[in-house]
Amino acid sequence: MVPGEEPARELMAVLLTPRFRRLVSQNELPGPGLNGPSSRNRRDGFCRKRRTGCSGPFQATQLWDGIIHSLQAQVEIKRRRHHLQTYKDCFTGSDAVDVVLSHLMQNTCLSSNDISCLKGVHLCQVLMNHKVFEPVGMKKLFKKEKELEFEDSNISLYRFLGNKSSYDCCKRQKDAENEFNETLRPGYEMISNPLAQEIGEERIEELIHTINGNPALCPNITVQKPFLRLSKEDVWKEQTLLCLLQLIHLPFLDNILEPPVKTQNLQLNKEEDLVITNTCLDRELIPSLCLPEK
């Protein structure tokens, strides 16, 4: 290879593809250097790589796989807008042509002076016909209509098909992880206090019974009765009354042990209904009234 041929190739690539984004420099390419004894070793290694890497019955398969892989890895995939509609995971036709031409320039088996933008467009057309990617926003109305043509422009949008896109694979893995986390999330996030839950349920049942006018609560609910503190005298009275009731079954024994104040009040209440008469006063008033005697 002539020492001045490599810069000429780079200049030709820039002139042919004005949108050229990435082109490996001469030091990064696996080709030979300009001068020096080390250039022979590089040249020998380069020739060996050319013989082994691009020869054999699987040469075409390796070339196509390399083009598709570089297209999937280097093309810019993002959300884009076209004809008042938004499409996800799309790339432009001009970006695809730039990536394909960059791969052709860097590949030692395919690099030649005949590489042009038109060949890059034809190569993208072949990839689209073989369902590597599909156009977005363009559909065939009739079966007899010709195949859609690939357009080298910033307006035409395309999207990868199947599992060939590494971007789609990463996205599907993330979606699967998110779904797995969502299925496990409720079990980890739900924290309950059984004691507080039981108290809340009891209060709700109490409220429902009071609203329905049914004071009787469910048998599962236990309500503590108010505790009355009794004096020693009251306790002795109750015990004595119980012993008497066991011996003599009379109902009037209930009021025997009550204090005298209460009995007096009861007697006064009973005496209010009685009529008190004065016999002396009656004897004096009856003759004066001249009432007929019976």
Curated annotation (Swiss-Prot):
Signal peptide: none annotated. GO terms for biological process: intracellular signal transduction. InterPro entries: DEP_dom (IPR000591), WH-like_DNA-bd_sf (IPR036388), WH_DNA-bd_sf (IPR036390). It comes from the Eukaryota. Coiled coil: none annotated. Residues 71-162 form the DEP domain. CDD domains: DEP_DEPDC4. This is DEP domain-containing protein 4. It comes from Homo sapiens.
